[in-house]
Amino acid sequence: MIGILKKVFDVNQRQIKRMQKTVEQIDALESSIKPLTDEQLKGKTLEFKERLTKGETVDDLLPEAFAVVREAATRVLGMRPYGVQLMGGIALHEGNISEMKTGEGKTLTSTLPVYLNALTGKGVHVVTVNEYLAQRDASEMGQLHEFLGLTVGINLNSMSREEKQEAYAADITYSTNNELGFDYLRDNMVLYKEQCVQRPLHFAIIDEVDSILVDEARTPLIISGQAQKSTELYMFANAFVRTLENEKDYSFDVKTKNVMLTEDGITKAEKAFHIENLFDLKHVALLHHINQALRAHVVMHRDTDYVVQEGEIVIVDQFTGRLMKGRRYSEGLHQAIEAKEGVEIQNESMTLATITFQNYFRMYEKLSGMTGTAKTEEEEFRNIYNMNVIVIPTNKPIIRDDRADLIFKSMEGKFNAVVEDIVNRHKQGQPVLVGTVAIETSELISKMLTRKGVRHNILNAKNHAREADIIAEAGMKGAVTIATNMAGRGTDIKLGDDIKNIGLAVIGTERHESRRIDNQLRGRAGRQGDPGVTQFYLSMEDELMRRFGSDNMKAMMDRLGMDDSQPIESKMVSRAVESAQKRVEGNNYDARKQLLQYDDVLRQQREVIYKQRQEVMESENLRGIIEGMMKSTVERAVALHTQEEIEEDWNIKGLVDYLNTNLLQEGDVKEEELRRLAPEEMSEPIIAKLIERYNDKEKLMPEEQMREFEKVVVFRVVDTKWTEHIDAMDHLREGIHLRAYGQIDPLREYQMEGFAMFESMIASIEEEISRYIMKAEIEQNLERQEVVQGEAVHPSSDGEEAKKKPVVKGDQVGRNDLCKCGSGKKYKNCCGIGK
C-alpha cells in the first residue's frame, strides 16, 4: 500500500520538478522584462499574436508570456505571482486541475493561462459558481488583461442578446456555469444565425472545479415550455374525429396501420375548424392533433395496445403482454388517447432542450480547473474529463493543527461540547468558523449560542446575499461564524492583525459524506502559512456513523460507563468514518458515471440534430437536402406497401392514396402504372413526378421567397419533432427501470429503444417536411417562428436540496405573442381572451 502511495506521490513530484524548470526559465526572463516601459509591455501582446500567425505555438510563448503577465500584475494589481502560482498556471494551460490550497491565490494564478490562451483570439471562458464571483474577478483581474490590450467581457443572466454577443466576442469572458450551458442550449433553438451569442467552445478554466464538475454533475440544465396550449386542441380534435366515418372521411390500412384523412375528411375538418386550407403552415399544430386523434381512435385499441389504470393510460408491451408503466407514446399520441378515454390529459411542462454540465464542458477543445480539494476525486476527473489533478505545493509550509475527531455518545452531548468549545475560544478572542452539513444544525447551534450570549453570524443558503461581507468579517478578533458546507467558497477569510499569532479555529459539527467537503472546511484555517486549528465533533447518532453500524461502538461506550460529556478519541473510529466516506464517494461516482452513460445516448442524438440545424441556418439553398428527404419518404412508403411475398397482396391502392393525400395531386400517379413495376422500380417515376411538382412551385414565386419558405418548413418540423422526442426520451428514461423483464440491462434497453425512437423521429421529420413542401400554400409574409418559446427561471437556493434538482427554465406567453394553438392570432385575441 505504501509502495502504491509513493508511486502516486512520485508522479506528482515528477510533474512539479518538470514545471520547476519552466518556472526557472520565466524567472530568468525577468531581468529583460522588468526594464520595459508600460507601452513596451503592452506592445508584447501584439508581438505574441504576430508570432502565433507565423507558426509559433502557445506552448512556445509560455515562458515569455507568463513573465509579461507577472510584471503587469505587479504594476497593475500590486501582486507578484509566486513560483508556485506560475506552476499552477502551467498545469492549467496543459488542461489539468491545479489543486491549490485555500488562500494560495488561485484567481491571480488563472490570469497567466487566460492571457496566454486568449492570444489566439478564439476566446477563453473563466467559469465561476455564482455571478458575484464572476463580476468580482472580471473587474479585478480584468484591469490586468485590459492593461495588456485584451478585451474582457462578463456574461450575466440579466443581459440582452446584444450584450451577451459582445461579452462572448471578447478575448476573455467571465461567466457562471449555468449561464454558459443555457446560452449553448438557446443558441441551438434560434432561427437566424445572427441570433447566436456563443463562439465555438475553445478553452475554459473552471474555478471551484470540483463543485461544478462533481457536485453539480447530476444537475441537468433544462429549458422548458408549457405544453398546456395543446390540451384544448386534443379535446377539439378528439370531438371532431368522433364525427368521422370510415372509408368516407378517412382510410385505414390494416397491414401498415396507416390511417389518413380522405379529401372528404379534409373538407370536413376545414369546415369544422373554420379554416381555408388544413395544410397551411399556420395549422401545423391542428393537423398534427387531428392525425393523432385519428390514430388514437382507429389504430389504438383499449385492453390490446393499452389499459386504463387508476385514471392513467398504461402501454401494453405487444410482445410480452406486460404493462410498461412510466412509458408514454411520443408525438402527442399518448395525450390523444387520454382525450379519447376521458382521463386527465397529462401535459406537464415540455422539455425543449437539456444538457448536463458533464456533457457541456466536455465539448471544449481544452478544459482545466482550480480548487483546493480535488485529489480525492482524481479518478473521476481523469476518466470522465481526461484531466489530471496536480497538487501544487504551498508557498509557505502549512502549520495548521488538524486534531483527531472527538466522538460523543449522543447528538446532545456533541452539541453541548461544540458550544462550550466556541464559548471558550470566543473569550480568548480567537475567531471561530463552525461548519455544519444542514441548515437546521446551523440554526440549532445559533440558538444555543444566543442563550450563552455569544454574538455570531449565520451563513447558509437562506442569507447568501450577505455572503461576502460575513466571510470578510469571519477572521476578526472574537468573530463567530456558522456556515453550511458550500457557503462562502471563493471568498477568503483574512485574519485580523491582532490575532495573527493565534489563527482561525475551524470546528466541524459532523463529517460530511465526502472527504472533499471536510477538507474544504479544514482548508479555511491556516492559509498562507498562518497558524490555525481544526477539530471535528462526531456523535454515534450522526447519519454517517449510523450508516456503517456504530451499534458495537455505542455498546462499548455503555459498557465502559462513559457518559455524554466524555468524548473518545479513537483511531479505529476515525478509520471507520473514512472508509464509510470512501464507500459513499464510490457510490456517488458510480451514479454520476451511470448518468453519463444514459446522457450519452441523448448527447449523440443532440449533436446530430444541432449540427443539422446549424447547416440549415447557414445554408443558402435547402432544395437538395429536401429532395433527399422526399426520396427517403417515397422509398419507405413503397417498401411499406409492398412488403408481402406475393404480388397480389401488395397494397398499391393504399400507396397511391398515401401519395395523393400527402405528396402529389390526384391523378399524378396511377395504380395500373405502378402495378407493372417491381418495388425497386416504383420509386423512380414517383420521385420524378415530385420534382416536376417542385419545379412548378418554384415558378410561382421569387427564388428568395421559396428558399425562405423551405427554411420555415424545416425549422418548424425539426423543432416540433425534436422537442417531442426529448419528452419521449424523458419518459423512456423514467420508465426503463420499472420494467421487470428479469435479466435485462436497463442501460442497453434504453440505448436500443432510444436509437429506434430517434430513427423513427428522423423518418417522421422527412415525411412531414416533404408533405408541407408539396402541399402547403405559401403566404407572402413568411416568418420563422419558435415552436414553443423557452423562458428562464433560475433555481432558488433555499436549502441544500435545491442542489440536485434540475435547473429549469420555464415558459410564458406574452399577450401580444402569437397564440400557441396554431390559429395565427395574437394570444390576447385567441385563447387569452378575458385572461
UniProtKB/Swiss-Prot annotation:
Catalytic activity of the protein: ATP + H2O + cellular proteinSide 1 = ADP + phosphate + cellular proteinSide 2
Gene3D superfamilies: Helical scaffold and wing domains of SecA, P-loop containing nucleotide triphosphate hydrolases, SecA, preprotein cross-linking domain
SMART domains linked: SecA_DEAD, SecA_PP_bind
CDD domains noted in UniProt: DEXDc_SecA, SF2_C_secA
Membrane topology: Peripheral membrane protein
Cofactor binding remark: May bind 1 zinc ion per subunit.
Family to which this protein belongs: Belongs to the SecA family.
Protein name per the record: Protein translocase subunit SecA 1
Species whose genome carries this gene: Bacillus thuringiensis (strain Al Hakam)
Lineage, broadest ranks: Bacteria, Bacillati, Bacillota, Bacilli, Bacillales
